[in-house]
Amino acid sequence: MHQSFDVVVIGGGHAGSEAAAAAARHGAKTALVTHKREAIGVMSCNPAIGGLGKGHLVREIDALDGLMGRVADAAGIQFRMLNRKKGPAVRGPRTQADRRLYREAMQREIDAMDNLTIIEGDAFDIEMDNDRVAAVIMKNGSRIPCGAVVLTSGTFLRGLIHIGSEKIPAGRVGEMPSLGLSDTLSRLGLAMGRLKTGTPARLDGRTIDWNAVDRQAADEDPVPFSFMTDHILNPQIECGVTRTTPASHKIIQDNIHLSAMYSGQIEGVGPRYCPSIEDKITRFGERDGHQIFLEPEGLDDYTIYPNGISTSLPAFVQEQFIRTIPGLEQVTILQPGYAIEYDYVDPRELKPSLECRKIPGLFLAGQINGTTGYEEAGAQGLVAGLNASLYAGSADPLHFSRTESYIGVMIDDLTSKGVSEPYRMFTSRAEYRLSLRVDNADLRLTPVAQKAGILGRERQQRFTDFLSDLDSVRALMKELSISPSQAAKQGLKLNQDGQRRSVYELLAYPDMTLQALAEHWPELNRLNAKVAEVLQIEASYAVYMQRQSADIVDIKRDEDRKIPDDFDFQSLSGLSNELKQKLEKARPENIAQAARVDGMTPAAISLLLALLRKGTATRSEQLRMHQ
């Protein structure tokens, strides 16, 4: 018998670490249950954090005082800002990470956390009392009483590795799957399915001909993920770049019937946006090559991750096709690539708080909800951990709007639409991406963290100072101004309309930069770099943001129009039975969510609104009669 906890988090991966940390920061007495303490923070697949859309999530996790941004900065060995030449709204920070440094940094963060206890072992079942979560039952029979549970099982629920025709029960290489919890979720009546993901072979970098491959360098001036990181201290390395060849493709095509994915033995659906090399050859057969990034797994590690050739072909076929790739002709394979399929829960079973609708006190986060990626998992973990703590303390949950964060976009997509394949974050999923940028994540979400009670003192002080600097510099930029005639004398092209324009307004002009304006106003050279960057981007988007603000107001109004938990969607007489069934399954909590259910039309929304207004009027009349 263990001591009682407010929150028990099952799983020590990226979702579990963030969930445990968020619950503990909020003040909940928290337990993190994991198979092995030393496996906390392990990067199971690619050794990288961030990217397009994903980098936004990492910045948002950091703005909420989560762990991933700081840990990535401590472990990053090749920082790059993707889409640097495009607009700020779609830029994506990314870094290669040293696997060992990442794991060690995450474990340091977890070990230093107050209110957090690590319990090693295998969680086997969840005990219920009056239809609510009451305890976690361990495989050894011991019991952990608790007020809420966050389940972050990753690929461990009935996990099955495939290498050709070989099947290995495992959550990841060398670790057994979780069978008991999968049975528990089925017993509790949750809708479940199977998904698949894959990973490439690991190569011995000492056997690669590095002179035969191209190189990709890190950015000269690396940009950290975390607001709290001043400088990146690790040496920055290069990655290799090579391509598959027609010879590679022929070997794959000739043996594709041996692939676990093409032989019919895998029932799970894989991620469309991270296809296996078999999928690439099948879907894009006209191409003569596919790019491969040779990514070192650490500063002191000769293991290479060949990003772009995940596969479930037999090991001997993998060796054959890999050795037809330039630079890899003599390579030694340290571990074959494989596919892994696992159970997941239909995320439409969840509320926006990530609590199960049918099981009060049970929260789910990460791949169990049908997502793929460390960043998606970490963001869900933070939300689930915080809301589990709020639930355990009988407080209202915190919901994230899709108008204020990529986290909100992801959770709304999952809980209102569900998934047919592993869900990955992209900037294109966010309607309001002009306002959801990586540069303003702190401005958007750190006040949310402060209000929720999960913001550390050091970050709070630094953020307060940053806001003060921002206000001062913004005022200066709006104070400094110039007339069209003065601008013409100084070589600045403005409309000759007689109106003075401030520096802040000038930054909205195409190709007008703070650096160029500093030639005319030298005081702009003395600005803090981060403050200057935020304000330059803010000013350049100001006109567009004004236009978008009306749409955001409309969305927030619809989010405020709540749908009662017991609302009878079958009573919507003007809707098709198919649409009623979709609404019953999705159980939208507000009009904004209902509008995103597949098949909903403006006419259907009008019917729903009319019935809600009628119900509100009826309840008001009943209240008056009882007074």
From Swiss-Prot:
Compartments, as annotated in UniProt: Cytoplasm
Pfam families reported for this sequence: GIDA (PF01134), GIDA_C_1st (PF21680), SAM_GIDA_C (PF13932)
BP GO terms, sorted: tRNA methylation; tRNA wobble uridine modification
Keyword Flavoprotein listed: yes
Residues that bind FAD: 11-16
Keywords: Cytoplasm, FAD, Flavoprotein, NAD, tRNA processing
Named cofactor requirement(s): FAD
HAMAP family associated with the record: MnmG_GidA (MF_00129)
PANTHER family assigned: GLUCOSE INHIBITED DIVISION PROTEIN A, PROTEIN MTO1 HOMOLOG, MITOCHONDRIAL
Similarity-based family: Belongs to the MnmG family.
Name of the protein in its database record: tRNA uridine 5-carboxymethylaminomethyl modification enzyme MnmG
